[in-house]
């Protein structure tokens, strides 16, 4: 019985989230907040740092592939780094690099938006 109640609550929560998201987009506030986030990340050097992490990982991976290929005669596609693998490596590091001031500012903007639509 509690599983059914939990599922119902999750469905209601998902509906509320969807309505908020739809309103956020249709009101234009999503674009405003998104542009502000991108600007703050750019100004903080976040994009450059994340790009450096990705480039370093690609170079490290390529060096490992070259090293293993020189030790064995068969090179194959298993050595290729996929986008998903690179993304999984970079994502947590990129999230950690978001400056606290940027996180706080964006959270404040979202909170203000929610306060305004709830009233």
Curated annotation (Swiss-Prot):
The gene is SUS1. Pfam families: EnY2 (PF10163). The keyword Metal-binding does not apply. It comes from Candida albicans (strain SC5314 / ATCC MYA-2876) (Yeast). This is Transcription and mRNA export factor SUS1. The keyword Zinc-finger does not apply. Belongs to the ENY2 family. It is found in: Nucleus, Nucleoplasm; Cytoplasm, P-body. Involved in mRNA export coupled transcription activation by association with both the TREX-2 and the SAGA complexes. At the promoters, SAGA is required for recruitment of the basal transcription machinery. It influences RNA polymerase II transcriptional activity through different activities such as TBP interaction and promoter selectivity, interaction with transcription activators, and chromatin modification through histone acetylation and deubiquitination. Keywords: Activator, Chromatin regulator, Cytoplasm, mRNA transport, Nucleus, Protein transport, Transcription, Transcription regulation, Translocation, Transport.
């Amino acid at each position: 019985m509690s599983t059914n109640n939990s599922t119902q609550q999750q469905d209601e929560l998902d509906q509320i989230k969807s309505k908020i998201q739809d309103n956020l987009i249709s009101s234009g506030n999503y674009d405003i907040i998104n542009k502000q986030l991108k600007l703050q990340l750019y100004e903080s050097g976040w994009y450059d740092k994340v790009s450096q992490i990705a480039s370093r990982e690609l170079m490290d991976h390529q060096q490992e592939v070259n090293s293993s290929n020189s030790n064995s005669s068969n090179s194959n596609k298993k050595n290729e780094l996929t986008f998903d693998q690179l993304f999984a490596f970079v994502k947590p590091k990129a999230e950690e690099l978001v400056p606290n001031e940027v996180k706080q500012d964006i959270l404040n903007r979202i909170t203000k938006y929610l306060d305004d639509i709830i009233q």
